[in-house]
Protein backbone atom coordinates (compact mmCIF):
# COMPACT_ATOMS: atom_id res chain seq x y z
CA UNK A 1 0.00 0.00 0.00
CA UNK A 2 1.21 3.52 -0.75
CA UNK A 3 -0.07 5.45 2.27
CA UNK A 4 2.37 3.89 4.73
CA UNK A 5 4.99 5.36 7.04
CA UNK A 6 7.14 7.80 5.05
CA UNK A 7 10.39 5.84 5.35
CA UNK A 8 8.67 2.66 4.21
CA UNK A 9 7.17 4.48 1.26
CA UNK A 10 10.58 5.76 0.16
CA UNK A 11 12.02 2.23 0.31
CA UNK A 12 9.20 0.99 -1.91
CA UNK A 13 9.18 3.90 -4.35
CA UNK A 14 12.95 4.50 -4.66
CA UNK A 15 15.18 1.74 -3.28
CA UNK A 16 13.66 -1.62 -4.24
CA UNK A 17 13.73 -0.83 -7.95
CA UNK A 18 17.53 -0.77 -7.73
CA UNK A 19 17.38 -4.47 -6.85
CA UNK A 20 15.07 -5.22 -9.79
CA UNK A 21 12.11 -5.66 -7.46
CA UNK A 22 8.88 -4.47 -9.05
CA UNK A 23 6.58 -2.59 -6.69
CA UNK A 24 2.94 -1.61 -7.16
CA UNK A 25 1.62 0.96 -4.69
CA UNK A 26 -2.11 0.85 -3.90
CA UNK A 27 -4.51 2.94 -1.86
CA UNK A 28 -4.98 1.33 1.56
CA UNK A 29 -8.74 1.78 1.49
CA UNK A 30 -9.20 0.53 -2.09
CA UNK A 31 -9.46 -3.19 -1.39
CA UNK A 32 -10.71 -3.90 -4.91
CA UNK A 33 -7.57 -2.36 -6.40
CA UNK A 34 -5.31 -4.28 -4.02
CA UNK A 35 -7.07 -7.58 -4.76
CA UNK A 36 -6.88 -6.85 -8.49
CA UNK A 37 -3.12 -6.27 -8.30
CA UNK A 38 -2.64 -9.40 -6.19
CA UNK A 39 -4.52 -11.47 -8.77
CA UNK A 40 -2.03 -10.38 -11.43
CA UNK A 41 0.66 -12.22 -9.45
CA UNK A 42 3.00 -11.12 -6.68
CA UNK A 43 5.42 -12.52 -4.13
CA UNK A 44 4.71 -10.27 -1.15
CA UNK A 45 1.89 -8.05 0.08
CA UNK A 46 2.89 -5.37 2.57
CA UNK A 47 0.20 -3.82 4.77
CA UNK A 48 0.08 -1.25 7.55
CA UNK A 49 -2.99 -0.96 9.76
CA UNK A 50 -3.78 1.52 11.15
CA UNK A 51 -1.62 3.61 8.84
CA UNK A 52 0.76 6.38 9.82
CA UNK A 53 -0.44 9.14 10.11
CA UNK A 54 -4.05 9.03 8.85
CA UNK A 55 -5.02 5.84 10.71
CA UNK A 56 -6.58 4.16 7.68
CA UNK A 57 -7.63 0.59 8.41
CA UNK A 58 -7.05 -2.46 6.22
CA UNK A 59 -9.25 -5.55 6.29
CA UNK A 60 -6.32 -7.85 7.05
CA UNK A 61 -8.15 -11.19 6.86
CA UNK A 62 -9.72 -10.39 3.48
CA UNK A 63 -6.43 -9.34 1.90
CA UNK A 64 -4.58 -12.28 3.47
CA UNK A 65 -7.06 -14.63 1.79
CA UNK A 66 -6.53 -12.95 -1.59
CA UNK A 67 -2.74 -12.95 -1.17
CA UNK A 68 -2.53 -16.60 -0.16
CA UNK A 69 -4.59 -17.60 -3.18
CA UNK A 70 -1.80 -16.00 -5.23
CA UNK A 71 0.83 -17.78 -3.06
CA UNK A 72 2.12 -14.44 -1.75
CA UNK A 73 3.58 -13.76 1.69
CA UNK A 74 1.70 -11.16 3.76
CA UNK A 75 3.65 -8.75 5.98
CA UNK A 76 1.83 -6.38 8.36
CA UNK A 77 3.34 -3.39 10.16
CA UNK A 78 1.47 -3.49 13.48
CA UNK A 79 3.33 -0.61 15.15
CA UNK A 80 0.33 1.69 15.62
CA UNK A 81 -1.98 -1.07 16.89
CA UNK A 82 0.50 -2.94 19.15
CA UNK A 83 0.04 -6.62 20.08
CA UNK A 84 -2.34 -5.53 22.84
CA UNK A 85 -4.90 -4.18 20.38
CA UNK A 86 -4.40 -6.32 17.27
CA UNK A 87 -2.80 -9.63 16.30
CA UNK A 88 -2.36 -9.91 12.51
CA UNK A 89 -0.91 -13.43 12.82
CA UNK A 90 -4.27 -14.64 14.14
CA UNK A 91 -5.85 -13.03 11.06
CA UNK A 92 -3.60 -15.10 8.79
CA UNK A 93 -0.63 -12.80 8.19
CA UNK A 94 2.73 -14.53 7.69
CA UNK A 95 4.98 -11.90 9.26
CA UNK A 96 4.36 -8.98 11.61
CA UNK A 97 6.64 -5.99 12.15
CA UNK A 98 6.88 -3.56 15.06
CA UNK A 99 9.04 -0.53 15.56
CA UNK A 100 9.97 -1.41 19.14
CA UNK A 101 11.22 2.16 19.53
CA UNK A 102 7.56 3.19 19.78
CA UNK A 103 4.89 1.58 21.95
CA UNK A 104 6.76 -1.61 22.86
CA UNK A 105 9.59 0.28 24.55
CA UNK A 106 7.24 3.07 25.52
CA UNK A 107 9.82 5.46 26.99
CA UNK A 108 11.51 6.99 23.92
CA UNK A 109 14.93 5.80 25.05
CA UNK A 110 15.73 2.72 22.95
CA UNK A 111 15.96 1.93 19.24
CA UNK A 112 14.86 -1.47 18.02
CA UNK A 113 12.61 -3.47 15.76
CA UNK A 114 10.69 -6.72 16.01
CA UNK A 115 9.67 -9.25 13.38
CA UNK A 116 7.63 -12.31 14.25
CA UNK A 117 5.76 -14.99 12.37
CA UNK A 118 6.15 -18.36 10.68
CA UNK A 119 9.26 -20.23 11.84
CA UNK A 120 10.44 -21.09 8.32
CA UNK A 121 10.40 -17.42 7.33
CA UNK A 122 11.93 -16.24 10.61
CA UNK A 123 14.79 -18.74 10.23
CA UNK A 124 15.63 -17.25 6.82
CA UNK A 125 15.51 -13.72 8.22
CA UNK A 126 17.60 -14.73 11.25
CA UNK A 127 20.32 -16.12 8.99
CA UNK A 128 20.36 -12.91 6.95
CA UNK A 129 20.57 -10.88 10.16
CA UNK A 130 23.60 -12.92 11.27
CA UNK A 131 25.39 -11.91 8.07
CA UNK A 132 24.46 -8.22 7.94
CA UNK A 133 24.93 -7.61 11.67
CA UNK A 134 21.55 -6.06 12.51
CA UNK A 135 21.77 -7.01 16.18
CA UNK A 136 20.21 -5.18 19.11
CA UNK A 137 22.80 -3.95 21.59
CA UNK A 138 22.46 -5.12 25.23
CA UNK A 139 21.36 -1.79 26.75
CA UNK A 140 18.58 -1.36 24.18
CA UNK A 141 17.47 -4.95 24.82
CA UNK A 142 17.34 -4.26 28.56
CA UNK A 143 15.35 -1.03 28.08
CA UNK A 144 12.85 -2.71 25.77
CA UNK A 145 12.32 -5.61 28.18
CA UNK A 146 11.79 -3.10 30.99
CA UNK A 147 9.30 -1.14 28.89
CA UNK A 148 7.27 -4.17 27.87
CA UNK A 149 6.55 -5.01 31.51
CA UNK A 150 4.07 -2.12 31.54
CA UNK A 151 2.87 -2.46 27.93
CA UNK A 152 -0.65 -3.63 28.76
CA UNK A 153 -1.16 -0.92 31.39
CA UNK A 154 0.15 1.82 29.13
CA UNK A 155 -1.89 0.78 26.10
CA UNK A 156 -5.11 0.59 28.09
CA UNK A 157 -4.61 4.15 29.34
CA UNK A 158 -3.62 5.40 25.89
CA UNK A 159 -6.65 3.73 24.30
CA UNK A 160 -8.99 5.37 26.80
CA UNK A 161 -7.45 8.83 26.57
CA UNK A 162 -7.19 8.82 22.77
CA UNK A 163 -10.89 7.96 22.45
CA UNK A 164 -11.88 10.86 24.70
CA UNK A 165 -9.51 13.27 22.96
CA UNK A 166 -10.70 12.27 19.49
CA UNK A 167 -14.32 12.75 20.56
CA UNK A 168 -13.49 16.19 21.96
CA UNK A 169 -11.62 17.30 18.84
CA UNK A 170 -14.37 16.05 16.53
CA UNK A 171 -16.75 18.61 18.07
CA UNK A 172 -14.27 21.52 18.13
CA UNK A 173 -15.07 24.37 15.70
CA UNK A 174 -11.39 24.83 14.74
CA UNK A 175 -11.03 21.20 13.61
CA UNK A 176 -12.01 20.11 10.11
CA UNK A 177 -11.63 16.35 10.57
CA UNK A 178 -10.36 13.82 13.10
CA UNK A 179 -8.78 10.52 12.04
CA UNK A 180 -9.22 7.87 14.73
CA UNK A 181 -10.53 4.31 14.18
CA UNK A 182 -12.56 4.47 17.38
CA UNK A 183 -14.85 7.17 16.01
CA UNK A 184 -18.01 5.99 14.24
CA UNK A 185 -17.29 8.66 11.60
CA UNK A 186 -14.01 6.95 10.66
CA UNK A 187 -14.21 5.15 7.31
CA UNK A 188 -12.58 2.04 8.78
CA UNK A 189 -14.44 1.98 12.09
CA UNK A 190 -16.46 -1.15 11.31
CA UNK A 191 -13.42 -3.15 10.21
CA UNK A 192 -11.38 -1.87 13.17
CA UNK A 193 -14.15 -2.93 15.55
CA UNK A 194 -13.94 -6.46 14.15
CA UNK A 195 -10.17 -6.97 14.09
CA UNK A 196 -8.97 -4.75 16.95
CA UNK A 197 -9.56 -5.07 20.70
CA UNK A 198 -8.74 -1.39 21.26
CA UNK A 199 -8.30 1.51 18.87
CA UNK A 200 -4.85 2.64 19.98
CA UNK A 201 -3.19 5.80 21.21
CA UNK A 202 -2.55 7.35 17.79
CA UNK A 203 -4.81 9.88 16.13
CA UNK A 204 -4.46 12.76 13.73
CA UNK A 205 -6.58 15.79 13.03
CA UNK A 206 -6.82 18.47 10.39
CA UNK A 207 -7.13 22.13 11.28
CA UNK A 208 -10.00 23.97 9.60
CA UNK A 209 -7.39 26.50 8.51
CA UNK A 210 -5.65 23.84 6.41
CA UNK A 211 -2.12 25.23 6.10
CA UNK A 212 1.35 24.52 7.43
CA UNK A 213 1.47 28.09 8.78
CA UNK A 214 -1.53 27.30 11.00
CA UNK A 215 0.22 24.15 12.22
CA UNK A 216 3.34 26.18 13.09
CA UNK A 217 1.20 28.58 15.11
CA UNK A 218 -0.62 25.83 16.96
CA UNK A 219 2.04 23.26 17.90
CA UNK A 220 4.32 25.56 19.99
CA UNK A 221 1.33 26.53 22.14
CA UNK A 222 1.01 22.99 23.49
CA UNK A 223 2.24 22.58 27.07
CA UNK A 224 1.83 18.86 27.80
CA UNK A 225 2.43 17.53 24.30
CA UNK A 226 6.04 17.61 23.15
CA UNK A 227 6.86 18.47 19.55
CA UNK A 228 8.79 15.34 18.59
CA UNK A 229 9.22 12.77 15.84
CA UNK A 230 8.81 9.83 18.19
CA UNK A 231 5.49 8.27 19.14
CA UNK A 232 4.07 5.64 21.45
CA UNK A 233 5.83 6.90 24.58
CA UNK A 234 4.45 7.64 28.04
CA UNK A 235 4.73 11.33 27.14
CA UNK A 236 2.27 12.79 24.63
CA UNK A 237 3.96 13.93 21.42
CA UNK A 238 2.64 16.02 18.56
CA UNK A 239 3.79 17.20 15.16
CA UNK A 240 2.89 17.61 11.50
CA UNK A 241 3.70 14.58 9.29
CA UNK A 242 5.72 16.97 7.10
CA UNK A 243 8.43 16.94 9.79
CA UNK A 244 8.43 13.62 11.71
CA UNK A 245 6.98 10.72 9.76
CA UNK A 246 6.97 11.90 6.13
CA UNK A 247 9.87 14.35 5.99
CA UNK A 248 11.37 12.29 3.15
CA UNK A 249 8.31 12.95 0.99
CA UNK A 250 7.54 16.03 -1.09
CA UNK A 251 4.30 17.99 -0.48
CA UNK A 252 2.98 16.46 -3.70
CA UNK A 253 3.77 12.92 -2.49
CA UNK A 254 2.10 13.63 0.85
CA UNK A 255 -0.97 14.97 -0.92
CA UNK A 256 -1.12 11.80 -3.05
CA UNK A 257 -1.15 9.79 0.19
CA UNK A 258 -4.06 11.86 1.51
CA UNK A 259 -1.91 13.82 3.96
CA UNK A 260 -2.92 17.52 3.89
CA UNK A 261 -0.50 20.24 5.00
CA UNK A 262 -2.80 21.14 7.89
CA UNK A 263 -2.70 17.65 9.39
CA UNK A 264 -1.31 17.10 12.89
CA UNK A 265 -0.31 13.70 14.29
CA UNK A 266 -1.00 13.17 17.99
CA UNK A 267 0.51 10.35 20.04
CA UNK A 268 -1.41 10.06 23.29
CA UNK A 269 0.67 9.50 26.40
CA UNK A 270 -0.39 8.31 29.84
CA UNK A 271 -0.88 11.74 31.40
CA UNK A 272 -4.19 12.72 32.99
CA UNK A 273 -6.78 12.82 30.20
CA UNK A 274 -8.43 16.01 31.44
CA UNK A 275 -5.05 17.77 31.41
CA UNK A 276 -4.44 16.72 27.80
CA UNK A 277 -7.87 17.95 26.68
CA UNK A 278 -7.40 21.25 28.50
CA UNK A 279 -4.02 21.63 26.81
CA UNK A 280 -5.61 21.19 23.38
CA UNK A 281 -8.38 23.60 24.32
CA UNK A 282 -6.00 26.42 25.24
CA UNK A 283 -3.78 25.83 22.19
CA UNK A 284 -6.74 25.86 19.80
CA UNK A 285 -8.09 29.11 21.28
CA UNK A 286 -6.01 31.12 18.77
CA UNK A 287 -8.28 30.02 15.92
Regions from the language model: what does each represent?
Residues 8, 121, 165, 210-214, ...:
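Short phosphate-engaging motifs
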Residues 1-174, 179:
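Conserved PLP-enzyme active-site core in the AAT-like
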Residues 163-234, 249-255:
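Conserved small-domain helix->loop->beta segment predominantly found in fold-type I
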Residues 106, 138, 195-198, 256-261:
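Short, flexible turn/loop "capping" segments at secondary-structure junctions
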Residues 80, 102, 150, 165, ...:
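Glycine-rich beta-alpha junction loops
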Residues 98-99, 131, 146, 226-233, ...:
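Residue-level signal for pocket-adjacent positions within structured domains
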Residues 4, 13, 22-24, 36, ...:
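PLP-dependent enzyme catalytic core of the Aspartate aminotransferase-like
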Residues 144-153, 200-209, 265-269:
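Short, well-ordered beta-strand elements within core beta-sheets of diverse protein domains
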